[in-house]
Each structure stands twice: as C-alpha cells, then as structure tokens.
Amino acid sequence: MIEPLVLGIVLGLIPITLAGLFVAAYLQYKRGNQFGLD
C-alpha cells in the first residue's frame, strides 16, 4: 500500500514536471525561430 505522503508528492510533482518540460520546449522553439534555426 502506498503511503499518502508519497502519493501526494508524486501527484504534486507530475504536473510541475510536465509544465516545466512544456515551458522549456516552448522557449527553445521561440528562441530557435528568433535566430532563424529550425
């Protein structure tokens, strides 16, 4: 059985991780277009 604390931490980190990856990819995409790179 999973401890509530561990479950809470995992459920809290997943959205943050996904958001971080999305922001990083978006910034890289914008920066690439700014310099004319694909």
UniProtKB/Swiss-Prot annotation:
Source organism superkingdom: Bacteria
Protein name: Cytochrome b6-f complex subunit 5
Short name of one Pfam family: PetG
Family: Belongs to the PetG family.
NCBIfam families the record matches: PRK00665.1
SUBUNIT field: The 4 large subunits of the cytochrome b6-f complex are cytochrome b6, subunit IV (17 kDa polypeptide, PetD), cytochrome f and the Rieske protein, while the 4 small subunits are PetG, PetL, PetM and PetN. The complex functions as a dimer.
Transmembrane as UniProt keyword: yes
Transmembrane segment boundaries: 5-25
Any one GO molecular-function label of the UniProt entry: electron transporter, transferring electrons within cytochrome b6/f complex of photosystem II activity
Role description: Component of the cytochrome b6-f complex, which mediates electron transfer between photosystem II (PSII) and photosystem I (PSI), cyclic electron flow around PSI, and state transitions. PetG is required for either the stability or assembly of the cytochrome b6-f complex.
Membrane topology, record value: Single-pass membrane protein
Primary location recorded for the protein, binned into one broad class: membrane
Gene Ontology biological-process entries: cytochrome complex assembly; photosynthesis
InterPro entries: Cyt_6/f_cplx_su5 (IPR003683), Cyt_6/f_cplx_su5_sf (IPR036099)
Organism of this sequence: Microcystis aeruginosa (strain NIES-843 / IAM M-2473)
Places the protein is found: Cellular thylakoid membrane
UniProt KW keywords: Electron transport, Membrane, Photosynthesis, Thylakoid, Transmembrane, Transmembrane helix, Transport
Assigned GO CC terms: cytochrome b6f complex; plasma membrane-derived thylakoid membrane
